[in-house]
Amino acid sequence: MSDIRKWFMKAHEKGNGSAPKSTSSKAGPVKNAAETAPIKSEQASEDLETADRRKTSKYFGKDKTKVKDEKEVEAIPAKRKLKTESDDLVKPRPRKVTKVVDDDDDDFDVPISRKTRDTTPSKKLKSGSGRGIASKTVDNDDDDDGEDKETPLKSAGRGRGGRAAPGASTGGRGRGGGRGGFMNFGERKDPPHKGEKEVPEGTPDCLAGLTFVISGTLDSLEREEAEDLIKRHGGRITGSVSKKTTYLLCDEDIGGRKSEKAKELGTKFLTEDGLFDIIRSSKPVKKSLPERSNKGTEKICAPPKTSPQKEETRGKPLAKSSPKKVPPAKGKNKIIETSLPWTEKYRPKVPNEIVGNQSLVTQLHNWLSHWHDQFGGTGSKGKGKKLNDAGSKKAVLLSGTPGIGKTTSAKLVSQMLGFQAVEVNASDSRGKANSNIAKGIGGSNANSVKELVNNEAMAANFDRSKHPKTVLIMDEVDGMSAGDRGGVADLIASIKISKIPIICICNDRYSQKLKSLVNYCLPLNYRKPTKQQMAKRLMHIAKAEGLEINEIALEELAERVNGDIRLAVNQLQYMSLSMSVIKYDDIRQRLLSSAKDEDISPFTAVDKLFGYNGGKLRMDERIDLSMSDPDLVPLLIQENYLNYRPSGKDEAKRMDLLARAAESIADGDIINVQIRRYRQWQLSQSCCVASSILPASLLHGSREVLEQGERNFNRFGGWLGKNSTAGKNRRLMEDLHVHVLASRESSAGRETLRVDYLPLLLSRLTSPLQTLPKDEAVSEVVDFMNSYSISQEDFDTILELGKFKGRENPMEGVPPPVKAALTKKYNEMNKTRMVRVADMVQLPGVKKAPKKRIAAMLEPTVDSLRDEDGEPLADNEEGNGSDAEEDSEEATDGEKLESNLKNLNARGIQVELDLKGAGSSGSRKAAGKGRGRGKAADTSAEKKATGRGSGAKRKR
């Protein structure tokens, strides 16, 4: 046993000796043994300590002897008492915690001041070990009772973490383990006593004005739970320590930037138990508990008189409802004003009231105010301005997320400058204007817009004298879909000839629909306002409507609506219908049931599934993320699941999880085949669970790099690129196969050609270029290409398919002059080359035959039917009545083919169509002609017979 362990055990013997109310039968012997035999006392204390480590608070609360001892102490909440009873007999901390709670009941201000004094960092805290803190409480046991009640407040929760099991500490889950060094960077450990402490409830504003920064792993709360607890009670959470930070919330000093910055600025350190005590002390109900128990049943009705906060909150809804009844008596204007939606009622009246983006509003104001000076109604661009200059743009494009004030700013700026705004939004037809306008602008909105920008005609309700200046607002231009065919192109044409300014508004300026429109507009990108800016505006609206809500709750509302201030005002109005005092939890509950739908990319979905909080997502949320793109999300998960390391798992456990995830991905692929091939769409959710949800739930955690130089973010699915390359190679191989079959030099199938023939073809095409002289090598290679009907594209295909990773390029040693001579020689012989396949030349007036059909025709089968003796059948024996039906069609096709072949022969191109069945079909044509045309038929028959006979002879 190490020296620090001996010192720690002796400290607890001293603490047990100073506990006067301990009724345990083992506490006394431990103290006596410490005086007579130190070695035996250490062994006894160690046995008690190890026995205590195997117990938790939920099981240890069943000890009846300790419950009787605790009854001597004044009453406290039952759940809290079970948590404090979970400590060992040798630890006097539970009794001290109960005394501190009683002390808190006497005076509410003491815990705050005491925590600020006791939670300053010390050397023992800096060591990161809970044992040092435990020794501090033992040293204070010798002091008077007042000091004894103050110090254990800090060590109650810290001591439990410090005295955790040794295995837990080495694993990084105890208080002494911490988050480790660089190798554990980015890993957030689970709280060592998660769910074992009762979370207190205080007044809603007990933490108002306090700013907290959370660092490290807390004792029983997750970081998100601690943030919600602080915000629920009016506190503010920031990400870094500054001069405005009140407390650094951490249960151990793990070092790092936050801790060093806090020590440098003198920021006070606060533990989780200290935070609980601050919140618990603000609740005045505990102060009246002893009074009700002592004064009997007559005093039971008294507590409502001692809780003024409830009286105030109950009286405020009445005060809120009374003004609602007053406005009807004040006139019709008030009735109309109260019936308006808040988004219209509190719409900004001047540009300065717009939340955020003031610089863009000023830029829009300057552009619109100088528009007529720049273009002067001439319809042409200003002189002296470059095309890429902002002042040379006749239109402006406002882009940004919905609800951040784009349309409002356009209308307010136009109104302030004296322009009359003509708005055209997605509900209007914005297609291409008619070229011939007979009735002016009547009946067509697109025509009215066209004439408006030309100033050729005006609507009936448009008074030119009163409004000499006009601005056209084209809202939601990225929503021009199939119903507005040609709308974007017509809008660009209108901008070019426009005599009035045009303001275009969209949500996504990077949409493919607006790719050409952006070049003709001045882009102004609106950004989301900060949550502080939105909370300030929402607080103004809440006060005007008589609502009670704190700024922290409004900031949470602003953060949840993703910068959409219109949605935030609507949600605030909905909640005001049922409550006049809105709390932090009310906003969270409201937005949880009516969250705004948003489009997320597959990368964002994978990040959320594999993130630290991926295990906390509900099942419906995981399904929504996986089904956001059911084709791409599983591919991204399969590409990146190996890079994720689950928190708190060793290498063996991680390999087991990887194997289970791979098996689940394979099952998902099998289900996907059933869905795509057999249209079993009822299995889509099963495929989603197997291919996305299960792998992400097994491996969610931190992402690490497996190869040096790799970027630490999710890669795009590599299967898509490989599948595209495989499809391209398959098409090229099909072309090569058809050409080789047409040459009659080989009758191999496509697989045989790829496996057996392709290496030999590659050697015959490249070896002469490397070994023989230039002229001889070029001639040999070109002759070989002609014999197998290999084109220049086929030559490149053979080279591409012959490349393998780790092997050298076949054309590596060929000099550039030889390559140039080969290309030149091949092109020179192109005019006299005999083309043996139909798809290598396009005959005018004849459709190109499908490649698969040509390949089937070129298969090495018997050209014509034969009789029992092996001789070809006669012409009149081959066909039946069906041949007679096809005679007329074949005759016309044959005439066209002959004329086209003559034209090609005149150009010097010799075409030989030596396909399957060519001779027999020609014979049928000749027989049909011979019946009615005499000599001409005989001549044609002789020609066809000659061709057929030669073909048959070659086959024999």
Curated annotation (Swiss-Prot):
Compositionally biased region (Gly residues): 158-183
Tissue: Expressed at high levels in flowers and siliques, and at lower levels in roots, stems and leaves.
Biased composition (Low complexity): 916-925
GO BP: DNA damage response; DNA repair; DNA replication; meiotic cell cycle; resolution of meiotic recombination intermediates
One Pfam family this sequence matches: AAA_lid_RFC1
Inactivation phenotype: The rfc1-1 EMS mutants show reduced plant growth and organ size, and early flowering. The rfc1-2 T-DNA mutants have normal vegetative growth, but have greatly reduced fertility due to a meiotic defect and produce short seed pods with very few seeds. The rfc1-3 T-DNA mutant is embryonic lethal when homozygous.
Biased composition (Acidic residues): 866-892
SUPFAM superfamilies (alphabetical): BRCT domain, P-loop containing nucleoside triphosphate hydrolases, post-AAA+ oligomerization domain-like
Localization terms from the record: Nucleus
Residue span of region Disordered: 1-206, 286-332, 858-956
Residues that coordinate or bind ATP: S399, G400, T401, P402, G403, I404, G405, K406
Compositionally biased tracts (Basic and acidic residues): 1-15, 50-74, 186-200, 288-298
SMART domains: AAA, BRCT
PROSITE patterns: BRCT
One Gene Ontology molecular-function label: ATP binding
Oligomer and partners: Heterotetramer of subunits RFC2, RFC3, RFC4 and RFC5 that can form a complex with RFC1.
Role, per record: Plays a role as mediator of transcriptional gene silencing (TGS), DNA replication, DNA repair, hypersensitive response (HR) and telomere length regulation. Is required in meiosis for DNA double-strand break (DSB) repair during meiotic homologous recombination. May participate in the RAD51-mediated recombination intermediate repair process. Is important for lagging strand synthesis. Promotes meiotic recombination via a specific pathway for crossovers (COs) that involves the formation of double Holliday Junction (dHJ) intermediates.
Protein name as it appears in the record: Replication factor C subunit 1
Species annotation: Arabidopsis thaliana (Mouse-ear cress)
